Amino acid sequence: MATSGTYVTEVPLKGSAEKHYKRWRSENHLFPDAIGHHIQGVTIHDGEWDSHGAIKIWNYTCDGKPEVFKERREIDDENMAVTFRGLEGHVMEQLKVYDVIFQFIQKSPDDIICKITMIWEKQNDDMPEPSNYMKFVKSLAADMDDHVLKA
């Protein structure tokens, strides 16, 4: 069995958890304008922008390289959490399992955290651990903060 693991980190954000959650849950089409240095495009492959089970295709830049990611969306409104379950793409060439959960938690009236949990399993033990992808998704949440505050 190949190596697997879970990374967890928290990104401090400003404003309301509801507003941030809404952006990640149903406004992905705004990502290229908001954080175009990371995300160049997001398209719907199956479903609707805000539907549980929707399949989206992302064009992004990680470590200076253009990549593509196809994911199935899981939505948990009660816990303000969105899961991106990896289906295909560059990251899936290295990993059998790649699930990223973004959960938005209000800490005070003006402060929230985005708790990011990445669950992964390598295709084989020769593949590197996906720490670069954790760094990437952490930067997505941090860089989206200003754009959400201005919305």
Curated annotation (Swiss-Prot):
Q: Which GO terms describe its biological process?
A: defense response; response to phenylpropanoid; response to zinc ion; vegetative to reproductive phase transition of meristem
**Gene Ontology cellular component list:** cytosol; mitochondrion
Judging by the UniProt lineage, the source's domain of life is: Eukaryota
Under the heading InterPro entries, the entry gives: Bet_v_I/MLP, MLP-like, START-like_dom_sf
Instruction: Name the Pfam families for this protein.
Output: Bet_v_1
Gene Ontology MF, one: copper ion binding
Family note: Belongs to the MLP family.
Its protein name is MLP-like protein 328
Source organism per entry reads Arabidopsis thaliana (Mouse-ear cress)
Q: Which gene encodes it?
A: MLP328
